[in-house]
């Protein structure tokens, strides 16, 4: 009885301290594919009053169970721990049902029934369990260390990758993403600039059209002004010719007038001397005045002198009954006068129409029957007669 109670206590302890069954996905799977657990229905149930002896470590074929203990060197396999990131949504927990528990208990009881004949030492079993726990702790510690080392390696690798990326960007150029973003921004900027340039081009085309219209207008004005300038140039040339002709005509007239003036001055001197000689010994009826200032005064003076000489020589014969004589000669114009007439005719041909020359000679007074015949009468020949007169004689000499 004592032995049975000891076995019961160990069995209860063995059941409580038995390793839990591992499911799929905990990272400790065996490489063998999972096998279905077969439950033999022909096995007789174990009587509850017969307690099996404490069982030894028996290799189990159930999947997901970590087998610890002595392992031969031929069967050892090196496993590289690789960190696998599994999303939480992909992890499912498989909780064994009561039927599976019953099957596993039946399987263990069958094993215990088969090994009931072998009686082991409970201390040895306890020590084995402790060794298993220690190995599990050691394996967990090693796994944690491996995990920490792999984390450090991952961190170092991440830093190395970052540095390599920086070196690659520095050697190759900009970051492709940044380069793409920059190209996109430049494209948008170019689109905006293209639109602005399109608007400017439209405005410039309108301005160009307006300028072309203005150019046509100014071209027509220029052509018209050019025609007018040509006409004005021709008219200017004609006026210059006329001006030169008029200038030469005026110069000729002035030179002729100066010549006539000199001759009239000489005539005035001769008439004055003649009149003074005719009045010698008589009462002076004419006294020379100051020199005339102009040609008109000179002509007037000569005319008066001629009248005085005429009156002194011929008297007043035939003045009351003058007779007209037909014009025997036509007065011609001087070259300067002809040039002046030509210039006037060119300048104003309508006003300078040729008028009939009215160049009738002045009425010549022929001698008529007169009481006193003048000394220098054409019908008398007294030019060579000399009269001796004293200083006391006065008046005119009359030939009887």
UniProtKB/Swiss-Prot annotation:
Motif Tankyrase-binding motif, residue range(s) on this chain: 22-26
Main localisation: Golgi
Modifications after synthesis and translation: ADP-ribosylated by tankyrase TNKS and TNKS2. Poly-ADP-ribosylated protein is recognized by RNF146, followed by ubiquitination.
Annotated GO biological process: Golgi organization; Golgi to plasma membrane protein transport
Annotated coiled-coil segments of the chain: 126-263
Name of one Pfam family that matches: DASH_Hsk3
Subcellular localization: Golgi apparatus membrane
Region span, Disordered: 1-36
Region listing for Essential for interaction with GORASP2, in residue ranges: 394-400
GO MF annotation terms: enzyme binding; ubiquitin protein ligase binding
GO CC, one annotated term: Golgi apparatus
Keywords of this entry: ADP-ribosylation, Coiled coil, ER-Golgi transport, Golgi apparatus, Membrane, Phosphoprotein, Protein transport, Transport, Ubl conjugation
Entry-annotated residues carrying Phosphoserine: 53, 356
Reported function: Required for normal Golgi structure and for protein transport from the endoplasmic reticulum (ER) through the Golgi apparatus to the cell surface.
Subunit structure: Interacts with GORASP2. Interacts with the GTP-bound form of RAB2, but not with other Golgi Rab proteins. Identified in a complex with RAB2 and GORASP2.
Free-text comment on this protein's domains from its UniProt entry: The tankyrase-binding motif (also named TBD) is required for interaction with tankyrase TNKS and TNKS2.
Protein name according to UniProt: Golgin-45
């Amino acid at each position: 009885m004592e032995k049975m109670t000891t076995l019961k206590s160990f069995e209860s302890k063995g059941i409580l301290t038995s390793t839990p069954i591992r499911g799929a996905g905990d990272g400790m799977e065996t490489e063998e594919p999972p096998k279905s657990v077969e439950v033999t229905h022909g096995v007789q149930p174990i009587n509850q009053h017969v307690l099996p002896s404490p069982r030894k470590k028996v290799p189990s074929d159930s999947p997901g169970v970590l087998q610890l203990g002595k392992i031969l060197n031929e069967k050892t396999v090196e496993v590289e721990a690789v960190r696998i990131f599994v999303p939480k949504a992909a992890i499912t927990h498989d909780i064994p049902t009561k039927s599976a528990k019953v099957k596993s208990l039946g399987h263990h009881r069958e094993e215990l029934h088969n090994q009931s004949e072998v009686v082991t030492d409970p201390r040895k079993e306890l020590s084995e369990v402790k060794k298993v726990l220690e190995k599990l702790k050691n394996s967990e510690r090693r796994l944690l260390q491996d995990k920490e080392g792999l984390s450090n390696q991952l961190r170092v690798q991440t830093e190395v990758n970052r540095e390599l990326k920086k070196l690659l960007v520095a050697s190759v150029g900009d970051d492709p993403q940044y380069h793409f973003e920059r190209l996109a921004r430049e494209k948008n900027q170019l689109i905006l600039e293209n639109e602005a340039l399109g608007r400017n081009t439209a405005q410039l085309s309108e301005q160009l059209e307006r300028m072309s219209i203005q150019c046509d207008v100014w071209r027509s004005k220029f052509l018209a002004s050019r025609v007018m300038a040509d006409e004005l140039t021709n008219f200017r040339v004609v006026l210059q010719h006329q001006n030169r002709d008029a200038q030469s005509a005026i110069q000729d007239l002035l030179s002729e007038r100066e010549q006539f003036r000199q001759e009239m001055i000489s005539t005035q001197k001769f008439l004055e001397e003649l009149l003074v000689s005719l009045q010698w010994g008589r009462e002076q009826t004419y006294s020379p005045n100051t020199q005339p200032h102009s040609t008109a005064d000179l002509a007037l003076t000569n005319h008066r002198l001629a009248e005085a000489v005429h009156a002194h020589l011929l008297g007043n014969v035939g003045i009351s009954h003058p007779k007209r004589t037909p014009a025997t000669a036509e007065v011609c114009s001087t070259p300067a006068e002809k040039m002046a007439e030509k210039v006037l005719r060119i300048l104003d041909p309508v006003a300078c129409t040729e008028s009939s020359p009215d160049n009738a000679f002045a009425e010549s007074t022929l001698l008529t029957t007169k009481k006193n015949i003048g000394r220098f009468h054409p019908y008398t020949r007294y030019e060579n007669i000399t009269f001796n007169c004293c200083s006391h004689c006065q008046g005119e000499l009359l030939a009887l």
